[in-house]
């Protein structure tokens, strides 16, 4: 990390429609700007609510991005206006979340989308959740608030979060926006920020074991075989041992060179587009769609469970439903592999616009890990998007 840059955390607001996610997002920027000017600036409700549409993996999603910072950290915060946008955002990973702020209205308590968002957060690997009970200004009865809090803690525990240990802050985003910066409701916003400050920083991609997906393979006369691609995580140095995983039997080799923009380097790291020279490997021994990895860090599998979102017709998806044993292509990292979908028991068919859990059996083994995102394609177009929730042996 460059000197002077604050550690960075990705945050997202989740919760039922109209419980106040967008108002809270506006209140966070407003209170922090009043209290700790710095790089903070007020972002109003309307600016967040009319979020621009973005395309991620062929899917259109409306997402608002705001940022704010504290003395010690920088936060990138994502808020989606519509429920469908949340589902799509979380499954495609268009905006990653290290921590989610669960917003629950004190007047309603937990609602169906509250549950759905918590489940999805767990499925897509959001490690931490902090909770904001909103609209507390309109609930006179302290006991009512305690019941809502208890209910939310129980719900979080049911979905595998630490319901007893999670920070729950009671406040009113609207009141915090209306009052002066040292008022009691603004203090509640600062209490929520304090809960975010306690979240452990995520492990940076650079500090994880090396992995790179192969995009292309070249033969350089006199030097050997070079594979190119973007380094997904970790660092590779000249002399490191690497495994070639997926599509075929595992091969082990050594990196004899790292190149970027035709310059020889000693190392390549997460985020770099690099060429890796491999010892004793012929051009025909390796192909697009395999991965290079630190020894023993990833294996290839043919089956997994996943959470998927199936595009609507208006999004360029299918016009008709599909049934169990539907066989599309799964675009995983840099390769398309045919596979068949098994629907959960009790689900007869899947309509465009649905999201659900499925099991997939691939025709060929591919390097897979939990949390990996993929596209579902048919005839060259994206018809769905998913994330692996469990690897099946």
Curated annotation (Swiss-Prot):
Specify where the region named G5 lies, as residue ranges: 172-174
**Region (G3) spans which residues?**
79-82
Q: Which CDD domains match?
A: EF_Tu, EFTU_II, EFTU_III
Q: Where is this region: G4?
A: 134-137
Q: Name the UniProt key words of this record, in alphabetical order.
A: Cytoplasm, Elongation factor, GTP-binding, Hydrolase, Magnesium, Metal-binding, Nucleotide-binding, Protein biosynthesis
Region annotation (G1) maps to: 15-22
A GO MF annotation of the entry reads: GTPase activity
Compartments where located = Cytoplasm
Give all residue intervals belonging to the tr-type G domain: 6-204
Name the Pfam families for this protein: GTP_EFTU, GTP_EFTU_D2, GTP_EFTU_D3
Q: Which reaction does it catalyse?
A: GTP + H2O = GDP + phosphate + H(+)
Q: Quick check: keyword GTP-binding in the entry?
A: yes
Q: Which residues bind GTP?
A: 15-22, 79-83, 134-137
Name one cellular component (GO) term: cytosol
The record ties this protein, via InterPro entries, to: EF-Tu_GTP-bd, EF-Tu_GTPase, EFTu-like_2, EFTU_2, G_TR_CS, P-loop_NTPase, Small_GTP-bd, T_Tr_GTP-bd_dom
Residues bound to Mg(2+) are 22
Q: Where is this region: G2?
A: 58-62
Q: What does the subunit section of this Swiss-Prot or TrEMBL entry state?
A: Monomer.
Per the entry, what this protein does is: GTP hydrolase that promotes the GTP-dependent binding of aminoacyl-tRNA to the A-site of ribosomes during protein biosynthesis.
Mind telling me what this protein is named? Answer: Elongation factor Tu
């Amino acid at each position: 990390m460059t000197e002077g840059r604050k550690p960075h955390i990705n945050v997202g607001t989740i919760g039922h429609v109209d419980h106040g996610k967008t108002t809270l997002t506006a209140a966070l920027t407003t209170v922090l700007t009043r209290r700790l000017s710095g790089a903070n600036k007020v972002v109003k409700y309307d600016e967040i609510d009319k979020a621009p549409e973005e395309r991620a993996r062929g899917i259109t999603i409306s997402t608002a991005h705001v940022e704010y910072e504290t003395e010690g950290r920088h936060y990138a915060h994502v808020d989606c206006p519509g429920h469908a946008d949340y589902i799509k955002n979380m499954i495609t990973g268009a905006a990653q979340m290290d921590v989610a702020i669960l917003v629950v209205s004190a007047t309603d308590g937990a609602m169906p989308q509250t549950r759905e968002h918590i489940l999805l957060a767990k499925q897509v690997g959001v490690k931490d959740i902090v909770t904001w009970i909103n609209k507390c200004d309109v609930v006179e009865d302290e006991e009512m608030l305690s019941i809502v809090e208890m209910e939310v803690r129980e719900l979080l525990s049911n979905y595998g979060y630490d319901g007893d240990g999670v920070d729950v802050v009671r406040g009113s985003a609207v009141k915090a926006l209306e009052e002066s910066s040292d008022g009691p409701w603004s203090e509640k916003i600062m209490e929520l920020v304090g809960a975010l400050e306690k979240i452990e920083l995520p492990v940076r991609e650079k500090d994880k074991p090396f992995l790179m997906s192969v995009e292309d393979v070249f033969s350089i006369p006199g030097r050997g075989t070079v594979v190119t691609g973007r380094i997904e995580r970790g660092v590779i140095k000249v002399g490191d041992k690497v495994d070639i995983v997926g599509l075929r039997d595992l091969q082990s080799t050594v990196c004899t060179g790292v190149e970027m923009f035709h310059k020889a380097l000693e190392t390549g790291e997460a985020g770099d587009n690099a060429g890796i020279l491999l010892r004793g490997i012929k051009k025909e021994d390796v192909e697009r769609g395999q991965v290079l990895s630190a020894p023993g860090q990833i294996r290839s599998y043919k089956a997994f469970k996943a959470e998927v979102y199936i595009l609507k017709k208006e999004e360029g998806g299918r016009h008709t439903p599909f049934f169990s044993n539907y066989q599309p292509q799964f675009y995983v990292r840099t390769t398309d592999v045919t596979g068949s979908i098994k629907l959960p028991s009790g689900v007869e068919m899947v309509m465009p616009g649905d999201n659900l859990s499925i099991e997939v059996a691939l025709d060929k083994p591919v390097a897979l890990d939990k949390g990996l995102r993929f596209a579902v394609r048919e005839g060259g177009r994206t018809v769905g998007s998913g994330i692996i929730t469990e690897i099946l042996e």
